[in-house]
């Protein structure tokens, strides 16, 4: 049999079908485009649905691809079975109303057996067909040289996922030989198509020839499709394992380089393909998950708490936990990204091009999880231990929620860890705790939006209402066309009138009040009667399902449906909001000018007091760039550029060069706002008339709010001036305390002070080292013996882990014992270190194993190398228990 690399296997498949007139379609983005039914592209045909449902006619009805895909429904099986993956590649050939069985079956056989192509031994290939599909069986037997005894009829060979196209299929299996047989010969599953390891399914060819109509349950009743299709799927990972004789898919060039790189970072474990062990599972999980994480982030997905971002976060945290099981400390996943890029370079060069961006995103997420990991593992271990000690089989929902809410452990990870210990998790209790938190959060919000839940009254409301706020902030003759409140039973209803003290929602036939949209908060103001008296105060304005602006008001004097009223927007507030909205456009454009192409708007909030702008960018924006951005925005303000807008169709807007917000959906007609020649964007908000109206722009803060997302908060006008003055006053206070003659002298004074502090710190470190060494001489005299090991345990008064390491260095000068265990605590933070002599290591002692055994006593966790390991915790009272556990551990060593 040929020995082929994964790249050769993939390319040979595509080349073969290209020779049969197929168009090679590149692998599409993992994030589905215009398909809300999918979280991820999860099959080879998923990106071609538009062709098979008839909504788009392909230029060439013959298509072939090798499509990356993600599935996580069987994530708990990854690493434990030979072939479960989260990211995989599906190779396929497709016919959209063109060829059918008579063509595809001989082609499949040619690709598999021809020496020019894969060249597999035909005697090792088996085929299954649907019993009623005698047509396919006949073609297999007459148009190929498949041995007659190698074809089986199987009832399951009918592809049907509900209403729509369906049909029989042929599955092709490769006989891996007796070495892979895991069942006796007489087992009912020991046949091609059965649940066994010997006969490996390598290809499925679906003959889509029937239409599953609503109400039909028997496929014999399905009518024939007028245009029959072919849909095939061949898993790259499976076929590569055949050509490389891999025991599992992981034992191939798609995974082994990742596993070998992970081995180098594990101090205690190596990968052995011939064994089924927990460590082997961890190696496989890491290799699988880093591939999925790398590709998903490369395609634009980011870790988050919901949707596909949650999938990435769960995969990453799952991989980190398996790294812990292998004794890997610190951030390690980023080091594997270049390995993935190198493996996939031939077909996915974009991974190598985006390696730095992918690594930054992973590093930020890994660091965030590692910050809480020790505490989370400690809590989880305690919870499991308590459950077992009390004879319980279930971890409470409250404990699982605390792990999720406080330590970032997704529920599924807690379930997996519990399952490993023979326990389950109270999911109902978890959901109750989650819902209770959400209820508390909603109650705590001071600005609940009345339109958060659309009621039936608003859904059915069809009365017309025009927004005139682009040119007016006051209307003298508006009619009340709807009053929405509660009836006597407290149910939402249309009312005929409103009385003082009521809180109701009003709809007018025309309104100047801007409804909250696109991050810009709503207008507020007043409703007046003909006499100019205030009858209601507008506190919020939202858009109803049918487009009307719905005004939440506090009623001052009574009014009724149909009354003519005047509407008056709070002008000062409206102007402040409009200026800040213009400032967000200036900031957006300037960020792209200064930082570059990876900046895209990720959200915004425009209030009268300040503006907030979220954008994609890896890592903090430097102080130098923040200064450039602030200066450039203020220069544009000083240039007094005109601000204009126009409504046009979306294609014309794109031709104008207008920038759209990524992920936003736009209608056929869009509004384009232009700020001179500086900026042009799709936008539906209100703005200043010229940039000079903003007066001044000041950045207040820049921070990270998630992996790959940054946030800038800023102010304009008098608020910006106040911010400058406040910072100047703070600098004056600092200058006075440093006795600086001028404000400009303060930085030099601070530098002098920093030099002095560093000098004192060095002196303090030296004194601490002397004290630690002095204490060490007494400690080293107290040597105990257990099971042939001499060991020392001691609690020292030093400043944390650095102080303990200094004592270890002194101990290593002459090794007065085989093992050294030291602890210290500052307030409630405990540091624990274990060191081993070379002789102890030769006898089989590993510091990392001991630290894992005793760290829970101090309420923490840790790990390290065989010669030295460390841990942190939050339970100083457990130090003596940890020391007592040392002798027990040594006594149990062989």
From Swiss-Prot:
Its main location: cytoplasm. InterPro entries: aa-tRNA-synth_II/BPL/LPL, Ala-tRNA-lgiase_IIc, Ala-tRNA-ligase_IIc_anticod-bd, Ala-tRNA-synth_IIc_core, Ala-tRNA-synth_IIc_N, Ala-tRNA_ligase, Ala_tRNA_ligase_euk/bac, DHHA1_dom. Transmembrane segments: none annotated. Keywords: Aminoacyl-tRNA synthetase, ATP-binding, Cytoplasm, Ligase, Nucleotide-binding, Protein biosynthesis, RNA-binding, tRNA-binding. It holds the Pfam family tRNA_SAD. It is found in: Cytoplasm. It catalyses: tRNA(Ala) + L-alanine + ATP = L-alanyl-tRNA(Ala) + AMP + diphosphate. Its EC number is 6.1.1.7. One of its GO terms (cellular component) is cytosol. It comes from the Bacteria. GO terms for molecular function: alanine-tRNA ligase activity; aminoacyl-tRNA deacylase activity; ATP binding; catalytic activity, acting on a protein; transferase activity; tRNA binding. SMART domains: tRNA_SAD. GO terms for biological process: alanyl-tRNA aminoacylation. PANTHER family: ALANINE--TRNA LIGASE, CYTOPLASMIC, ALANYL-TRNA SYNTHETASE. Consists of three domains; the N-terminal catalytic domain, the editing domain and the C-terminal C-Ala domain. The editing domain removes incorrectly charged amino acids, while the C-Ala domain, along with tRNA(Ala), serves as a bridge to cooperatively bring together the editing and aminoacylation centers thus stimulating deacylation of misacylated tRNAs. NCBIfam families: alaS (TIGR00344). Belongs to the class-II aminoacyl-tRNA synthetase family. Catalyzes the attachment of alanine to tRNA(Ala) in a two-step reaction: alanine is first activated by ATP to form Ala-AMP and then transferred to the acceptor end of tRNA(Ala). Also edits incorrectly charged Ser-tRNA(Ala) and Gly-tRNA(Ala) via its editing domain. This is Alanine--tRNA ligase. It comes from Leuconostoc citreum (strain KM20). The lineage of its organism: Bacteria, Bacillati, Bacillota, Bacilli, Lactobacillales.
């Amino acid at each position: 049999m040929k020995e082929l690399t994964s790249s050769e296997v993939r390319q040979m498949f595509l080349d073969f079908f290209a020779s049969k007139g197929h168009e090679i379609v590149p692998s599409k983005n993992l994030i589905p485009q215009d398909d809300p039914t999918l979280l991820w592209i999860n099959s080879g045909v998923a990106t071609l649905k538009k062709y098979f449902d008839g909504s788009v006619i392909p230029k060439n009805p013959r298509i072939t691809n090798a499509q990356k895909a993600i599935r996580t429904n069987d994530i708990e099986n990854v690493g434990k079975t030979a072939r479960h993956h989260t990211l995989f590649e599906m190779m396929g050939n497709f016919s959209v109303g063109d060829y059918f069985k008579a063509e595809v079956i001989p082609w499949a056989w040619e690709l598999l057996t021809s020496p020019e192509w894969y060249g597999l031994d035909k005697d090792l290939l088996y085929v299954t067909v649907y019993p009623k599909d005698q047509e396919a069986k006949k073609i297999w037997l007459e148009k190929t040289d498949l041995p007659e005894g190698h074809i089986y009829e199987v009832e399951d060979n009918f592809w049907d996922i509900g209403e729509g196209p369906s049909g029989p299929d042929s599955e092709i299996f490769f006989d891996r030989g007796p070495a892979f047989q895991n069942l006796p010969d007489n087992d009912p599953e020991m046949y091609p198509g059965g649940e066994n390891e010997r006969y490996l399914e390598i290809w499925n060819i679906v003959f889509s020839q029937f239409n599953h109509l609503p109400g039909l349950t028997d496929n014999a009743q399905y009518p024939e499709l007028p245009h029959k299709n072919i849909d095939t799927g061949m898993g790259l990972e499976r076929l590569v394992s055949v050509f490389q004789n891999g025991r599992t898919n992981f034992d191939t060039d798609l995974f082994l380089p990742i596993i070998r790189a992970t081995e180098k970072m594990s101090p205690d474990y190596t990968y052995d393909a011939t064994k089924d062990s927990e460590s082997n599972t961890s190696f496989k999980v890491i290799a699988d998950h880093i591939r999925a994480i790398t590709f998903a982030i490369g395609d634009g997905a980011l870790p988050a708490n919901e949707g596909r971002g949650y999938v990435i976060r769960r995969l990453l945290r799952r991989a980190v936990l398996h790294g812990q099981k292998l004794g890997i400390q610190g951030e390690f996943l980023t080091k594997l990204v270049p390995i993935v890029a190198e493996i996939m370079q031939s077909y996915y060069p974009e991974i190598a091009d985006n390696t730095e961006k992918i690594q930054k995103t992973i590093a930020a997420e890994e660091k965030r999880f590692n910050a809480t990991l020790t505490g989370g593992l400690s809590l989880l271990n305690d919870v499991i231990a308590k459950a077992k000690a009390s004879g319980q089989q279930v971890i409470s929902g409250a404990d699982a929620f605390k792990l999720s809410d406080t330590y970032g452990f997704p529920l599924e990870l807690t379930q997996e860890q519990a399952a490993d210990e023979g326990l389950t998790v109270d999911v109902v209790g978890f959901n109750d705790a989650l819902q209770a938190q959400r209820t508390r959060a909603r109650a705590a919000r001071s600005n609940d939006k009345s339109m958060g839940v659309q009621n039936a009254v608003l859904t059915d409301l069809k009365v017309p209402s025009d927004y005139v706020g682009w040119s007016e902030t006051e209307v003298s003759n508006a009619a009340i066309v709807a009053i929405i409140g509660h009836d006597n039973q407290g149910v939402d209803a249309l009312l005929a009138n409103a009385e003082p003290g009521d809180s109701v929602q009003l709809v007018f036939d025309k309104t100047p009040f801007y409804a909250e949209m696109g991050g810009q908060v709503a207008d507020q103001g007043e409703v007046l009667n003909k006499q100019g008296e205030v009858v209601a105060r507008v506190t919020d304005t939202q858009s109803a399902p049918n487009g009307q602006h719905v005004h939440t008001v506090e009623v001052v004097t009574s009014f009724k449906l149909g009354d003519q009223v005047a509407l008056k927007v709070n002008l000062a507030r409206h102007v402040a909001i409009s200026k800040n909205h213009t400032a967000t456009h200036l900031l957006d454009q300037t960020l792209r000018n200064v930082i570059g192409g990876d900046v895209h708007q990720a959200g915004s909030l425009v209030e009268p007091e300040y503006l907030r702008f979220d954008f994609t960018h890896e890592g903090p924006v430097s102080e130098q760039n923040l200064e450039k951005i602030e200066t450039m925005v203020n220069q544009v303000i000083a240039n007094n550029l005109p601000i204009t807008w126009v409504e046009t169709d979306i294609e014309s807007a794109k031709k104008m060069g207008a920038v759209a917000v990524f992920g936003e959906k736009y209608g056929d007609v869009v509004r384009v706002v232009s700020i001179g020649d500086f900026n042009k964007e799709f936008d539906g908000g209100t703005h200043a008339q010229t940039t000079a109206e903003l007066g001044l722009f000041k950045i207040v803060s820049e921070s990270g709010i998630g992996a790959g997302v940054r946030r800038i908060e800023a102010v304009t006008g008098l608020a910006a001036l106040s911010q400058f003055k406040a910072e100047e006053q703070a600098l004056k206070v600092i200058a006075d305390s440093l006795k600086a003659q001028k404000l400009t002298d303060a930085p030099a004074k601070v530098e002098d002070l920093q030099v002095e502090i560093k000098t004192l710190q060095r002196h303090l470190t030296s004194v601490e080292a002397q004290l630690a060494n002095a204490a060490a001489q007494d400690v080293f005299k107290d040597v105990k013996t257990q099971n042939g090991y001499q060991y020392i345990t001691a609690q020292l008064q030093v400043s944390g882990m650095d102080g303990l390491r200094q004592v270890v260095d002194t101990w290593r000068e002459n090794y007065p014992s085989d093992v050294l265990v030291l602890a210290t605590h500052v307030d409630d933070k405990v540091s624990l270190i274990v060191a081993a002599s070379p002789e102890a290591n030769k006898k089989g002692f590993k510091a990392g194993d001991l630290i894992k055994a005793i760290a829970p006593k101090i309420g923490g966790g840790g790990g390290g190398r065989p010669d030295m390991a460390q841990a942190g915790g939050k339970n100083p009272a457990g130090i003596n228990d940890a020391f007592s556990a040392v002798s027990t551990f040594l006594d149990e060593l062989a």
